[in-house]
Regions:
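Positively charged
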Residues: 1-172
């Protein structure tokens, strides 16, 4: 396993729509393991392949809050089948939008169909933080970031801040 570099906004790659995976093989499994290791190293709870520069429809997550316990989840070619009309608000952040957080409203429940780590078709009924995390990561597959749900002013302020941060770290 290897820790990969996480791409941060502003970056055109993050706005790209990811392509479906044709089959889950050793290469895809290695990518998923690398993504998980990268996510854990960055103290995240979810990561999409596009965030490490791979435009494939793969996401990994682990929302387990118990210390020293891991419950990794792998989603290949996920498709949301149903969304609850009832909304829930969570404070969201993103490894590709470092140190920025905002309250985002999303459907409180969703049903997602996907291929698991072994390429087996699965159906998951998710609610709460899991549903929010799935929808957040699936947005990445469409080139959407959580800041896109904010007002134009807030979004442009965040992007300006991140651009300055990138410039200052590039100069070091």
């Amino acid at each position: 396993m290897a820790i990969r570099t996480i791409i941060t906004e502003p970056n055109k790659l993050l706005r790209q729509v990811s392509k479906p995976v044709t089959k889950v093989g050793k290469e895809e499994q290695k990518l998923m393991k690398d993504m998980l290791e990268t996510m854990y190293a960055a103290n995240g709870i979810g990561l999409a392949a596009i965030q490490v520069g791979i435009p494939q429809r793969i996401i990994v997550m682990d929302i387990c809050k118990e210390e020293n316990k891991k419950e990794p989840r792998y989603f290949v070619n996920p498709i949301i089948k149903n969304k609850d009309p009832l909304k829930a608000t969570y404070e969201e952040g993103c490894l590709s939008v470092p140190n920025q957080f905002a309250d985002i409203d999303r459907p409180s429940k969703c049903e997602v169909e996907y291929l698991d780590y072994n390429g087996q078709k699965q159906l998951l009924k998710a609610e709460g933080l899991l549903a929010t995390c799935i929808q957040h990561e699936m947005d990445h597959l469409e080139g959407i970031l959580f800041i896109d749900y904010l007002s134009k002013l807030k979004r442009s302020m965040i992007i300006k801040k991140l651009s300055k941060l990138k410039l200052s770290t590039a100069e070091v």
